[in-house]
Amino acid sequence: TIHLSEQIQLINVERREEDKKTTEEAIIQIKDKEEELFSSTLVYHDNWHPGIIGIVASRLIEKYYRPTIVLTKRNEYYIGSARSIKGFDSYKALKKCSDVLEQFGGHKYAAGLKLHESKLELFRNEFEKLTNKHISDEQKINSCIYDLEISLSDLNIKSVSYTHLRA
């Protein structure tokens, strides 16, 4: 049992390292292609591990707050994961792009997709047009709704702990 536990721990550490490396590579790609200026994010690499691209897409949503697609290549196809923001239905967007996709499925905030490598740029352009048309500048800002204002002088360990427990 201990041996199995150690193996699982090692696999988890490797997954975290791969996740971190892939996320860093995706951020570099976004900056290099100036995707921060777009209404959506689409990043891809031939050798990213398909088991972590959904996690990477979620991390990119946290950082850039745009509908995000992360793709990796398998033979002549890109397979990937889409994540969305409040107010934008990623499944409906993929459905509108279905003429260039081999497969897709999912729901409003998360989906999977597969497309031929020859259709990548066409898909990228179609998806960006959809997001640009349906997402306002206000939607590109991750907002938080709060119940009350607290002054700095009201904060102490007990109140912060209580607030953390209720979140």
Residue spans of the language-model regions?
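Conserved short beta-strand edge segments in small beta-sheet-based binding/regulatory domains
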Residues: F104-H107, D137-I141
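Hydrophobic helix-and-loop "lid/oligomerization" segment in the mid-to-C-terminal part
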Residues: T1-E121, S151
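Conserved small/polar residues in nucleotide/adenosyl-binding loops
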Residues: T163-A167
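Short amphipathic alpha-helices in soluble, non-transmembrane regions
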Residues: L94-C97, E126-L130
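A common structural junction motif
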Residues: D99-E102, L130-S136
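Short beta-strands and strand-coil junctions in structured, solvent-facing domains, enriched
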Residues: P50, H134, S153-L155
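Short, low-order "capping/linker" segments at domain edges
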Residues: N156-Y162
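Upstream accessory/linker segments immediately N-terminal to the RecA-like ATPase cores of bacterial MutS
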Residues: K140-D147, I157
